A protein has these predicted regions:
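Beta-strand-enriched cores of mature, soluble protein domains
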Residues: 1-168
């Protein structure tokens, strides 16, 4: 059905999550948690142009509100990556995580080895840069599906498989 868009594989994002900061909220029904991060990678899918092979620089934050019923998380993540050719790119994604027992287990630390399935976390990713090679990323639409990965003795990693929305 050519009237519907398709997804072209673009890249894989892996972010190591630091300990959450329970900020709270005096004016909302759902408290704010901030999860900082300073380590992670972007790796392009084969054939995707422009290739975005990069590392997170500085400290980014994922601002998260849980729905009052505890079934979903609302994400608003901000960070900066530096590509292999030294370009800086601001990355923002928003999204929703459906909390099943698998997600709850990893996010609470009850599960120390394992991963959640892809399909309970979806995001919309945008980019901003002053670098000529990557400027067209600002004009494209990207979506991702994610999962959480826990390994004993290591930080929890959130992994996204990201694709560009294209005409079929």
């Amino acid at each position: 059905m050519s009237e519907f868009p398709s997804i072209q594989p673009a890249f894989t994002i892996k972010i190591e999550l630091d300990a959450p900061l329970a900020v709270g909220s005096a004016s909302r029904n759902n408290a704010l948690q901030v999860i900082p991060f300073s380590n992670g990678t972007f790796e392009s899918a084969p054939g995707f142009e422009p290739a975005v092979d990069a590392n997170i620089v500085g400290t980014g934050n994922d601002y998260i509100h849980a729905d009052p019923d505890g079934q979903h998380l609302r994400l608003n993540c901000h960070g900066v990556i530096k590509t292999n050719d030294e370009a800086l790119i601001y990355v923002n994604y928003t999204g929703v995580v459906t909390l099943t027992d698998a997600e709850k287990g990893i996010l609470t630390g009850a599960t120390v080895d394992g991963s959640t399935p892809f399909g309970n976390s979806f995001t919309h990713i945008t980019f901003e840069t002053g670098h000529e090679r990557y400027k067209d990323l600002e004009n494209r639409v990207f979506v991702g599906k994610g999962r959480f990965v826990a390994q004993k003795g290591k930080k929890v990693v959130v992994e996204y498989r990201v694709g560009q929305v294209v005409h079929a």
